[in-house]
UniProtKB/Swiss-Prot annotation:
Obligatory cofactor(s): Mg(2+)
Species of origin: Cupriavidus necator (strain ATCC 17699 / DSM 428 / KCTC 22496 / NCIMB 10442 / H16 / Stanier 337) (Ralstonia eutropha)
EC number: 3.1.21.10
Pfam family, one: RuvC
HAMAP family per record: RuvC
Record keywords, A-Z: Cytoplasm, DNA damage, DNA recombination, DNA repair, DNA-binding, Endonuclease, Hydrolase, Magnesium, Metal-binding, Nuclease
Record keyword DNA-binding present: yes
Matches recorded under InterPro entries: RNaseH-like_sf, RNaseH_sf, X-over_junc_endoDNase_Mg_BS, X-over_junc_endoDNase_RuvC
UniProt protein name: Crossover junction endodeoxyribonuclease RuvC
CC cofactor note: Binds 2 Mg(2+) ion per subunit.
Active-site residues from the entry: D7, E67, D139
Gene symbol of the encoding locus: ruvC
Binding sites annotated in the UniProt record for Mg(2+) 1: D7, D139
Length: 181
């Protein structure tokens, strides 16, 4: 399975492509899509949309994973990030890809094993997990991390969805991301 990970941003959007074969992950490509800060917002969003579309055509992924927006201290920044994320999702869906969403916390737990990991720790673990010769930039590393998060979680999600009816009958439910009974 080939997975395209996206770390959305209005100035710089990171992308990372990995392949999953059984339990093994293999690096395919990564990079960034940059928009001109002097352009209008609609032009910047189109640059992002076109870039995501081109990456999708070039690497032909089976699915995409994108980081969810977090609410920032500055509401204007959150709104702009949400618009950039929307443009990225439109580019992915326009290519016909199923899109999966993950929080920064899920990404950090999947890659580093610790939800409060910093960017340097994510970069280091992405480099190790994919056996890269050098560290990718922080945006590309986050995108690769989202792809790794999906690769690691897709088997678990499939298994859990098959078990869901049995667990419900036994009185089990998910609370705060944990299975409780």
């Amino acid at each position: 399975m080939r997975i395209l990970g996206i770390d959305p941003g209005l100035r710089t959007t990171g992308f990372g492509v990995i392949e999953k074969h059984g339990n093994k992950l293999a690096y395919v490509a990564s990079g960034t899509i940059k928009s001109d800060g002097n352009s209008t917002l609609p032009e910047r969003l189109k640059t992002l949309y076109d870039g995501i579309s081109e990456v999708s055509r070039t690497y032909a992924p089976d699915c995409a994973a994108i980081e969810k927006v977090f609410v920032n201290v500055n509401p204007q920044s959150t709104l702009l990030l949400g618009q950039a994320r929307g443009a990225a999702i439109c580019g992915l869906v326009g290519y016909g890809l199923p899109v999966f969403e993950y929080t920064a916390l899920q990404l950090k737990v999947a890659v580093v094993g610790y939800g409060r990991a910093n960017k340097a720790q994510v970069q280091e673990m992405v480099t190790r997990l994919l056996m890269l010769p050098g560290q990718p930039g922080s945006d590309a590393a986050d995108a690769l991390g989202v792809a790794i998060c999906h690769a690691n979680g897709s088997d678990t999600l499939g298994t859990l969805s098959g078990l869901a009816p049995d667990l419900v009958r036994k009185g089990m439910r998910v609370r705060r991301g944990r299975l409780v009974g």
